[in-house]
């Protein structure tokens, strides 16, 4: 049996002989062992006694009488002349088995087609395999493991999932899955994390995990960043009161933030410098439910009581700045036109003789102005370009992310945030997200780079913050909060 100190499923499988040469029907690897008096958690492979090329994999809680927490369906592999158990066919079979288990924990159990493409040419295959394996084990621990094992084993598995190698493996696995299955994978994982955090907070015996998952890739002319995070795991920026309504708590916390940021970039060659122009292609943020609509209605307040994006801030910075000559933005600061409407009136009345004045005069003045709910700003700090979108209160013009609604507005059925997903003037999509595209926000940020940098790989750091705010939609409550998520990724481009 492999050691529990540093579980490595891929390396352990490489040590196994072919299935036909096993001297016993079952082989096991220790995943974690809390201590000598508690049972260990094992990953086990079991050969079918009736079919020499068929096996199952399982997760076993190794009590005095072992308990199977999960057993896969029988998996058949192709016979080969390999001297080891682990070959391309076995890797593909196991990897697809792990992925299938994770996807089946998704609230939306839709049919899917998944095949591993070009497995032998996949770089960091070991990292991809171990990432899928530990994600599978992570979900089994959350949903199936007894309390005596769960806490310690979850910490062991989480520590494996947050290593640099696992982060690289996760990016490569997402490429293999494709966009649709990637979303299902992250919803399965973040549903499990949400359940775990709620359990942690209920018993207060362990610090909440850091479940943000983000990745970026750079290709010719395009940068792209994906991010996913359960709402319950986001940092609380402000809150006006304790949330005691259990149904509202359920609705607000069983959602996740899904974000996509896309930039187009182009290099213009000049006599003495390069112009690197970066412009917004798409910035998308959605708040997606993690459980089905029926459960949200029965245990919560329905799907429409959820957070909405209230501020998005992005910063792009070249990491090596010795060859940067200047940076400029193309959007001016706001100089809004304000419209005034002045109404004046005089009202005269005759008062009784014993009053000091016999005439009353009153005047009134009305001011109106028009504004869009979302305001976009560009700014520069050093060689960093900052892009920020602010949502403003349609009633008083304040920034939503840094303010709280009054109790009067919370009870007003005509307030802008009431019925916000069906209102014709909503500042969101029908589903409650936002899309900022190049048609309205296509201005470029321009860096001038010295010609001596030709042929070099330029590295840019993108740092971002997303704020989500909850103000009541249809539910009658005075509760409100704003949460924040921070992320950081690296982007690359080659200078000619």
PLM feature spans:
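Proline-rich intrinsically disordered, low-complexity coils
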Residues: 7, 17-20, 28, 33-34, ...
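Generic structural motif
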Residues: 34, 48, 119, 239, ...
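Long amphipathic alpha-helical coiled-coil/heptad-repeat bundle
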Residues: 2-110
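Deployable pore-forming modules of oligomeric membrane-permeabilizing proteins
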Residues: 83-84, 88-345, 373-429
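Intrinsically disordered, low-complexity regions enriched in Ser/Pro/Gly/Gln/His and often acidic
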Residues: 5, 15, 178, 189, ...
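Membrane-insertion modules used to breach or fuse lipid bilayers
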Residues: 330-383, 413, 419, 423-495
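Short, well-ordered strand-loop elements centered on a beta-strand within folded domains, enriched
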Residues: 3-5, 58, 93, 275, ...
